Amino acid sequence: MQANTASLPADGAPVENPAARLISIPFLLLRISTAGGAFAMGLVQTLVFARVLMPDRFSLFILVGAIGYSLWLCDLGLAKILFVQLRAAHLAGKTDARAASQATAVIVFYVLLAAGGSLVCFGLMAVRPSFSLLDATDFGLFFFYITLNLTWVCLRSLSIAVDEYVFYEKLELVRRVGNMATILAMLIGLPFTAFLVGSNVLWAMLVTSAVAKLLSRGAMAPQLRGFARELMAFFQTNMQSIARSGTFALSDIFIYTFPYYVVPWAFGLGAPIIILEATFRIFRGASVIYTAACDLAIPGQTRALAARDAAMLVRTTLIAAALCCLPAAFACGLLIFASKQLFAFLLGSAATVPPTVTPILVVMLLANLVQMVAQSLLLHAGFFREISRIGLGVAVAMVAATAIAVVAGLTIVEFLGVYAAVYSAGALYLAVAAYRGPILAAASPHGAVKWKRAAEPAAAR
């Protein structure tokens, strides 16, 4: 296991202000509102798309969105590595100019990746005789709208690293409110293309604001010339960490997106993929809320690791887990007692979700809670090697289970059951790794003896 405890001061003293050691109240309020907005926006998008698009067109946009999220395969965990480096410098009261330049290079790379992918999407749709140029433009803009999330998530990691999480969450709140307003406006006649153009313009404004703030805090460098050189230097310097965190990032996004490729192939477009989208919209929405709760604990967790304060590390992690339990209990209760009404309201006449999906989704939500709490602690403590091994193992198991499900001729509901079983096993393994890794590492300099390189700085990795 490769912990990052040494990249934070090993002899750091505990923070004097106890309140600063746990959770920021302004961050708590903002993060709850933006996470709730993210969950609501996902449901609203599905609800509106199901009503303004024909089922076959709706299923195509679902597939294009899944392909867009698949570009996160190019993330390779770069944002997490930048977080570790910038956070270490910030806690030491310093500015890491090299890390700032490389952060700029990574952000530019992500923006260019989104733009290039959207142009490819436009071109592929434009050559199909069944689509007009306007249709192709819509698909390209939607692809760009989806893939810019990769840039935005990286900006979030950089903001948290330098304690600018409140500013970031204000921008996130603006984004959620603006996007939800334009989505709902389609119900009263706003053209679909206008929604896409407006949403991407909003993206441009928000990304510009976030970058400006990070530049002022020294977390990014005010230069674009030579960004390719800085990007290559970042890859060369952090090759081992990228290989490990990248393995996790690849397997993680694969686990979440590969059903969108399996279902159209094995079960067809139309109702099957719409059922998958409705199920995963709730599943991924819960992930956003869980991530928000876990983000609240990151400043306290990293300070606890720096001070080797295991008690504080456990307290902040348990607080995050408790916060996750609140929305989980609400969502599970809603599904158990009103899933039929919920899915009918969400999808209208586009598709009908079988009632047997409900218990499977409840299991997925609970497993996701365990996974997100453990994974967040491992990631932000720098334990990339172990999470990459677990992620790779879960991905391989998922492929094998899917192959068996397809050969056996299982239904889409049975396929979702197999997915939930493998996913739950991976979540439990991550929980064990979180205890054996960062918690033991914080308890004692020798507490994580099994992780041989726990004292190696992030830059050397």
What do these predicted ranges mean?
Residues 58-62, 66, 139, 270-281, ...:
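Small-residue hotspots at the loop-to-helix junctions and early N-terminal turns
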Residues 26-38, 64, 72-125, 308-332, ...:
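Membrane-water interface segments that mark the loop-to-transmembrane alpha-helix transition
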Residues 148-174, 363-393:
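Membrane-interface junctions at transmembrane-helix termini in multi-pass inner-membrane proteins
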Residues 2-24, 193-200, 210-256, 300, ...:
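Interhelical loop/hinge segments that connect adjacent transmembrane helices in multipass membrane
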Residues 140, 169-220, 393-397, 411-436:
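Hydrophobic alpha-helical transmembrane segments
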Residues 26-46, 172-179, 199-220, 229-299, ...:
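Transmembrane helical elements of multi-pass membrane transporters/channels
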Residues 76-92, 161, 220-221, 283-308, ...:
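Helix-loop junctions and terminal segments of transmembrane helices
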Residues 20, 125-142, 270, 311, ...:
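Interfacial segments at transmembrane-helix termini and the short loops linking adjacent helices
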